[in-house]
Amino acid sequence: MSSVSILDYGVGNLLSVARAFQYFDASVNLVSTPEEIMSADRLVLPGVGAFEDGMKGLTTLNFIEPIKQFARSGKPFLGICLGMQMMLSKSTEFGQHEGLGLIAGEVVSVPSHGVDGQLHKIPHIGWNELVSTSEGEDWCHTILKNIPLNSSVYFVHSFMAMPSNPKKRLADTLYDGQAISAVIKDENMYGCQFHPEKSGEVGLSIIQQFLQI
């Protein structure tokens, strides 16, 4: 049986994430102490809300250094929504805030308009398609292994991750033509801007692949 540990730090929809992993009979542990992090086989950092609040939650529980150590261990790591954003170096959401620095880059506002110059709704909410990126690696050996191009997943966000190295962008989505990082990857670490646990069969397939790493 595969096992996964989900960080419980007061910011995130833990139950829906846990249920998605339990769908595949995974053993799920909700992590509330630093010691549990390094003993995990796979680690998931969920999150909704503001970047600053998320980092404060991790700091309060003394999770920062154990997360960094886990990420360097080579074991599978997945950040979801805010969790993905916190993987980066910093965020400009309501000020300047330091992130985990697992992947170099910054979190910036989703553009307020499409490529045609027309304003669109912020936050970006709803189903959007996954597209390959020009410099990212092939999906065949990643958590997107069985995902057809242009599969739709569910987004809810006002900010987006911008890795410094475009090769870390595994998949994008286009919001009125504006490219947004949908999946990022650096060796054993993955981040999904969308919610796989809310993305139907496509999201479940991604979760299943993560359990098989």
Swiss-Prot record:
Any GO molecular function: imidazoleglycerol-phosphate synthase activity
Protein name, entry field: Imidazole glycerol phosphate synthase subunit HisH 1
GO CC annotations on file: cytoplasm
NCBIfam families assigned to the protein according to its UniProt record, in alphabetical order: IMP_synth_hisH (TIGR01855)
Gene: hisH1
GO biological process: L-histidine biosynthetic process
Organism: Legionella pneumophila (strain Lens)
Pathway of action: Amino-acid biosynthesis; L-histidine biosynthesis; L-histidine from 5-phospho-alpha-D-ribose 1-diphosphate: step 5/9
Principal place of residence: cytoplasm
